[in-house]
Amino acid sequence: MSGTLPPASGVPSPPGFGAVLETPEVSALRRRLHGRVLEVVSRMPRPLAEDVAALLGRHGRTRTADQGDLFVLFPAPVWSFLHWVPAARHPDIERLHAAALLLHLWDDHLTDRQLVPDLAVLQLRTELWRCLEQDTSALCAAWGVDPGLVARHTERYLCATHAPRTPADLDSYCSIAREQAALWTLLPRLLETGGRAVAGWSSLVEDFAVAWRLVDDAADVRRDAVAGIRSAVWWELSGAGRARWDAWSRPDGRTDTSGDVHGAAPWDGSEDARCAEGVGRVLARAAALLAAAVDRAAAAGEEGVVTELLTARAGVLTSARRPF
C-alpha cells in the first residue's frame, strides 16, 4: 500500500489501477470517512490527539479537504461499497469500516518502520481496535449475528500479519493476502450474515484486496528487491531471476526518501527487463481477480461497482501490455 512519486519525464509510470471517476456522492463519502477517523482520534488524550490529527492530515491532502483526505490512499471499491449498499449508509458503520481500513495500513507502516511507534501512534492503534470491537458488538446485537464471526475475522488478520506462514508459491502468497484482508471483509460479511446485503460482497472486497496487493507488488519491484522482500513478483521469476533478486537485498533494508537503498548498486533498465515477465504474470493474476469481482458485482446488479472495477482493471491491463 505504498504511495509513489510522479515518474520522471520519459519514464513509464508504475503499474496501477485505472483512475475511477467518482460520483459526487462517492467523493463525499470518501471525505466523510476521514472525519469518522477523526471521531476516533477525538477519544484520545488531547496532546496525543493533536499529534495524530496532524499526522493524518498530512496524508492524502487535497484541494477540497485541507484537513486531510486519508482515503484517497485506498482505491474504490474497498470503501465505496458503503455508498452502494443502502444498509451501510450509517455513521457508526462508516466509522467501523474506516477504522478497519486504517488499522491494516497503520499496522503495515508500523511493521515496515514508516511510522515511529511513539505514544500517539500506538494510542491511535488502541483506539481503532476499541472502535472496531464496540461497533461490531453493537451490529451483532442489532442484526442477530453471532459475535464469533468477528472473533474469527480478527484472529485471521492477526495471525496472518503477526506471524505469517512462509508461502510456497504465488497461490499460497495470495492466500496469505486474503487472510490479511480479513479486517476489510469483516463489515461486508456482517452485512451479508445479518441479511442487510446480498451474498458476494465480502468475496468481492477480498478479491479486490488481493488484486491491490499484486498491483502494488508489480509497482514496487525495485524497492522490494533491494529491501529483500520476496513479493509476488519474486514467485513468478525463474530460479536465476530469484537468485539475482535475493542478491540485491541488504540486511538492514534502509532506504532514503527516494526509495534508494544505501550502498546498493544502481538498478538499471536491464534489471527491470529481467523482471518484466514476472511482473506481467502478476498483473495477469490481478486482472483475473478483478474480472471475478466484476462478475460478482454484475450478479448482484451493482452497476456502479461494476464501473469502478472495470475502470480499475483497464489500468491493470494497460500496465500488463506495457514494456518495463
Regions found by a protein language model. Name each.
Residues 122-126, 148, 202, 280, ...:
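Short, charged, amphipathic alpha-helical segments
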Residues 96, 100, 291-324:
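Short hairpin/turn module used for nucleic-acid contact or packing/dimerization
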Residues 40-53, 63-77, 93-96, 100-101, ...:
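All-alpha helical catalytic cores of prenyl diphosphate-utilizing isoprenoid enzymes
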Residues 113, 152-156, 309-313:
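Short acidic/histidine-centered micro-motifs embedded in hydrophobic/aromatic stretches
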Residues 105-130, 135, 187-194, 206-277:
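Acidic, Mg2+-coordinating active-site segments of isoprenoid diphosphate-utilizing enzymes
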Residues 137-155, 159-164, 241-304:
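Primarily interfacial, aromatic-capped hydrophobic alpha-helices that serve as membrane anchors
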Residues 2-115:
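N-terminal domain-start signal
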